[in-house]
């Protein structure tokens, strides 16, 4: 699916953008990363009932911004908060495998901190799982089909075991 927001991700530094006449591209990409962060926070707050995060929460943000930008915002967040034990080791490993835009400014500030998601880390970890799963399914539709096909026999077997125990 094509994202609604088609602003390309800009991977170079602001200094590089300035030297090459691409400063507006840098700024637009950076502002879009911040908007993506805000929309992730908003989606989580609308779809988390205090105990459960709706299964389609990540899908709506991915539809808006696409896999590349959502991955960048989420990975930057986990990398920035890598000390936090509420992020799973799997999500941490994934986050450190994602190529991020250069964030260091000439003054030494990391501009990526502007798009660090501030939602509760345990809930955000669930959102990251959802996003990663949705991205995999979009990249390889067979994954979704296999998951559904594997789940049906397992559910039937569990139901059969429960029925047998009741006898």
Per-region residue spans from a language model:
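Gram-negative host-targeted secretion-system effectors, predominantly Type III and Type IV
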Residues: 1-166
């Amino acid at each position: 699916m094509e994202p609604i927001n088609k602003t390309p991700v800009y991977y170079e530094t602001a200094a590089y953008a300035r030297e090459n006449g691409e400063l507006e591209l840098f700024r637009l990409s950076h502002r879009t990363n911040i908007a993506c962060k805000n929309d992730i926070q908003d989606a989580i707050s609308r779809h988390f009932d205090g105990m459960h995060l709706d299964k389609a929460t990540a899908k709506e943000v991915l539809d808006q911004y696409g896999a590349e930008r959502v991955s960048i915002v989420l990975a930057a967040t986990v990398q920035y908060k890598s000390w936090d034990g509420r992020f799973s080791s799997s999500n941490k490993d994934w986050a450190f495998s994602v190529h991020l835009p250069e964030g260091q400014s000439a003054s030494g500030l990391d501009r990526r901190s502007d798009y660090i998601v501030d939602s509760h880390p345990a809930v955000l970890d669930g959102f990251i799982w959802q996003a990663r799963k949705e991205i995999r399914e979009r990249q390889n539709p067979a994954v979704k089909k296999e998951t559904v096909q594997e789940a049906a026999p397992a559910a039937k077997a569990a139901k059969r075991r429960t029925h047998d125990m009741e006898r």
